[in-house]
Amino acid sequence: YAAQPEWVRLRDSYAEAAGDDEYAGKDLRIAVVRAMLADGQGAAAEDFFFAHCQGKVGDADCAMLIAGHYKAKKDAVALDAFAGKVSLRYDSDTQKVKSLTK
């Protein structure tokens, strides 16, 4: 277990600590997404986002991290696909993510 990447440990600790409270775990959700992206795991970050972040407090932060990651890598296909699926707590936040595709 110790040989696993940091994001795996963070993801697993989130899974153990997560409840149904949309406010709880915001910082840990952001930390999980950051660690996944730092390890080049964009697909894993998206999976985690859609399973645990979207619709909860901090979802815009997580979505912008993922979208920004794709933009920095100049991966327009992944960015467009992600932005097309995102639906955040606030429409204005959703539009911020979509604006990165331009």
Regions picked out by a protein language model, each given a short descriptive name:
Residues 1, 74-77:
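Short coil/turn connectors between adjacent alpha-helices in alpha-solenoid helical repeat scaffolds
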Residues 15, 30-34, 50, 64-68:
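Amphipathic alpha-helical repeat scaffolds
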Residues 7, 21-31, 56-65, 90-101:
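Generic helix N-cap/helix-start motif at coil->alpha-helix transitions
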